[in-house]
Amino acid sequence: MTETRGARATEAFFGRRKGKPLRERQAAHLENLLPELKIDLEHAAPADLKELFPVSVERVRLEIGFGGGEHLIHRAAEDPATGFIGVEPFVNSMAKLLGQIEAKAIRNIRLHDDDATQVLDWLPAASVDQIDLLYPDPWPKRKHWKRRFVSEVNLDRFARILRPGGVFCFASDIDSYINWTLIHCRDHAAFEWTAAGAADWLAPFAGWPSTRYEAKARREGRSSAYLSFRRS
């Protein structure tokens, strides 16, 4: 436990953040629906994470920082056999996703509305099949690069919770962050970049739904990279 606290002491903490005022229905979703879907970190995680879900699932996938929720809701709807855990501290984004979950009657999503490292440290070892980190905050200034979510400490966390053969997927339109992630994963013994050629990282992931972040990057003339790393 001391080791975990020490690691966290060097990390930037991202708590609940709020933007523009919520609509009445969005506020109601946060008050009534979120408590039903939120994972309870006060109790130990079940040895089998499939027990977190009210429906039968065959595998578990974690998305860190789901933003507008387009990707998470699309994946959950197209793949009901997978249980999804979505983490997002931004209140407005969480409220938006909750509305989509209700509208589409999605039952294979559980949520956390605070720091993702709390979830990473809570999850059992070798319990997750895939981790998605898509268009994370790039912290573009060099002096802030240490705040990027991809770090040796967090890759250790990923390696602990991913099953052997599990996948870490990363997408970004910021060249310095793409290179940063490639270097960090190359230097980590637990991860192997799966790309065999340029098409493997320039083309979106299979079944990828376009997101507003990706669309913004294209409008501003930036191309994206889609990196996959296999847990050894």
Curated annotation (Swiss-Prot):
Keywords: Methyltransferase, S-adenosyl-L-methionine, Transferase, tRNA processing. One of its GO terms (cellular component) is tRNA methyltransferase complex. The keyword Transcription does not apply. Pathway: tRNA modification; N(7)-methylguanine-tRNA biosynthesis. Catalyzes the formation of N(7)-methylguanine at position 46 (m7G46) in tRNA. Belongs to the class I-like SAM-binding methyltransferase superfamily. TrmB family. This is tRNA (guanine-N(7)-)-methyltransferase. It comes from Sinorhizobium medicae (strain WSM419) (Ensifer medicae). The lineage of its organism: Bacteria, Pseudomonadati, Pseudomonadota, Alphaproteobacteria, Hyphomicrobiales.
